[in-house]
Swiss-Prot record:
This is Ketol-acid reductoisomerase (NADP(+)). InterPro entries: 6-PGluconate_DH-like_C_sf (IPR008927), KARI (IPR013023), KARI_C (IPR000506), KARI_N (IPR013116), KARI_prok (IPR014359), NAD(P)-bd_dom_sf (IPR036291). Involved in the biosynthesis of branched-chain amino acids (BCAA). Catalyzes an alkyl-migration followed by a ketol-acid reduction of (S)-2-acetolactate (S2AL) to yield (R)-2,3-dihydroxy-isovalerate. In the isomerase reaction, S2AL is rearranged via a Mg-dependent methyl migration to produce 3-hydroxy-3-methyl-2-ketobutyrate (HMKB). In the reductase reaction, this 2-ketoacid undergoes a metal-dependent reduction by NADPH to yield (R)-2,3-dihydroxy-isovalerate. Binds 2 magnesium ions per subunit. Mg(2+) 1 binds at D190, E194. Its cofactor is Mg(2+). Its EC number is 1.1.1.86. It comes from Methanococcus maripaludis (strain C7 / ATCC BAA-1331). Keywords: Amino-acid biosynthesis, Branched-chain amino acid biosynthesis, Magnesium, Metal-binding, NADP, Oxidoreductase.
Length: 330
C-alpha cells in the first residue's frame, strides 16, 4: 500500500477554490483552521447563531449559514455527526450542488450505505485524519501532523485526486503520511475497530477485570489501578514500539503471565463474535439498527449512557483521577 508524503502533494488544485467546512466540532475546528493556515480559502457553514457560531467567528473564520456556504463553495466538506448528515444534506446542501463541485467527508458512512446520493457531475471524496481533532490541530501547529486517509468515490472532473490530496496537504496529514483507500474499506474497518476493539471491546474487558477483582474482595481502588489506570502505560508502549518491544519493556513476570493466559480471555468464541460483528457491518444490519435508534430519539443509547455512568468503576475512577491530578475538582 503506497504512502504519500508532503512532497507528493500540491495545493495548486485549491488555489482558486473555496472550501466550505460544514460543522465546527473537534474535527471541523481543527481541519478548517489548518487549511486556513495553509493559505486555503475556507468558509464555515453552521446553524445561524448556534453554539459553534461565535466560536468559529472568534477563531477568525468567515462564518455563514450552511445554505450560504454550500452555494458559495467549490468543495463542501461535511463534518457533522453521521446521523445528521443525510437530513442536512437533503435540505441545505443538495439544492446548491452543481456540476464540477466536490462533496467531501471524513467518514464514508453516509455515502457507503447510500443515505446520501450525490447528483451526476459532482466529485465525491474523503479525507480523514486518523486522530482526534485536538491532536490534528496541535501537531499541525508544532510543524508536523497526523497520518490520514484519502478516498475517491466519484471523479466527475478528472482531477478529484488533485483536490483531495491538496486538502490532505492543507490539513497537514501528508506531513506524517497519507494512504489511499476506498469508502467501503474506510467505513467498514472504522466501524469494526470502534465496536470490537477500541470502544466496545476494551471497555468491556476493563469492566470485567475490575468486577472480577472487586467480587473477590479486593479494594475497588486497587482493582481500578490494575485494570484501568495502568492500561494507558501499556497502550502507549504498543503505540510507540509495537507488541514485541512492549513485551521487552514489561517485567518477565508480566510477559510470561500475559503470553500464557491471554488466549483464555480472548478465545475462539471471541473471534467468532468479532466475525459476526463484522458481518453486521458489511451487510448493513448495524446501519439499519442505528437508523432505527435515531428514529426513537436515541432512547436505547441514552439508557445505556445512564447505566454506564452508574457503574462502580466510574465512581472509583473519578476519585482516583482527581487524586492523580488528571481530573479537576468541580
Amino acid at each position: 500500500m503506497k504512502v504519500f508524503y508532503d512532497s507528493d502533494f500540491k495545493l495548486d488544485a485549491l488555489k482558486e477554490k473555496t472550501i466550505a467546512v460544514i460543522g465546527y466540532g473537534s474535527q471541523g475546528r481543527a481541519q478548517s483552521l489548518n487549511m486556513k493556515d495553509s493559505g486555503l480559502n475556507v468558509v464555515v457553514g453552521l446553524r445561524k447563531n448556534g453554539a459553534s457560531w461565535e466560536n468559529a467567528k472568534a477563531d477568525g473564520h468567515n462564518v455563514m449559514t450552511i445554505e450560504e456556504a454550500a452555494e458559495k463553495a467549490d468543495i463542501i466538506h461535511i463534518l457533522i455527526p453521521d446521523e445528521l448528515q443525510a437530513e442536512v444534506y437533503d435540505a441545505q446542501i443538495k439544492p446548491y450542488l452543481k456540476e464540477g463541485k466536490t462533496l467531501s467527508f471524513s467518514h464514508g458512512f453516509n455515502i457507503h450505505y447510500g443515505f446520501i446520493v450525490p447528483p451526476k457531475g459532482v466529485n465525491v471524496v474523503l479525507v480523514a485524519p486518523k486522530s482526534p481533532g485536538k491532536m490534528v490541530r496541535r501537531t499541525y501547529e508544532e510543524g508536523f501532523g497526523v497520518p490520514g486517509l484519502i478516498c475517491i468515490e466519484i471523479d466527475a472532473t478528472n482531477n478529484a485526486f488533485d483536490i483531495v490530496s491538496a486538502m490532505a496537504k492543507g490539513i497537514g496529514l501528508s506531513r506524517a503520511g497519507v494512504i489511499q483507500t476506498t469508502f467501503k474499506e474506510e467505513t467498514e474497518t472504522d466501524l469494526f475497530g470502534e465496536q470490537a476493539v477500541l470502544c466496545g471491546g476494551v471497555t468491556e474487558l476493563i469492566k470485567a477485570g475490575f468486577e472480577t477483582l472487586v467480587e473477590a474482595g479486593y479494594a475497588p481502588e486497587m482493582a481500578y489501578f490494575e485494570t484501568c489506570h495502568e492500561l494507558k502505560l501499556i497502550v502507549d508502549l504498543i503505540y510507540q514500539k509495537g507488541f514485541k518491544n512492549m513485551w521487552n519493556d514489561v517485567s518477565n513476570t508480566a510477559e510470561y503471565g500475559g503470553l500464557t493466559r491471554r488466549s483464555r480471555i480472548v478465545t475462539a468464541d471471541s473471534k467468532a463474535a468479532m466475525k459476526e460483528i463484522l458481518k453486521e457491518i458489511q451487510d448493513g444490519r448495524f446501519t439499519k439498527e442505528f437508523v432505527l435508534e435515531k428514529q426513537v430519539n436515541h432512547a436505547h443509547l441514552k439508557a445505556m449512557r445512564r447505566l454506564e455512568g452508574e457503574l462502580q468503576i466510574e465512581e472509583v475512577g473519578a476519585k482516583l483521577r482527581k487524586m492523580c491530578g488528571l481530573e479537576k475538582e468541580e
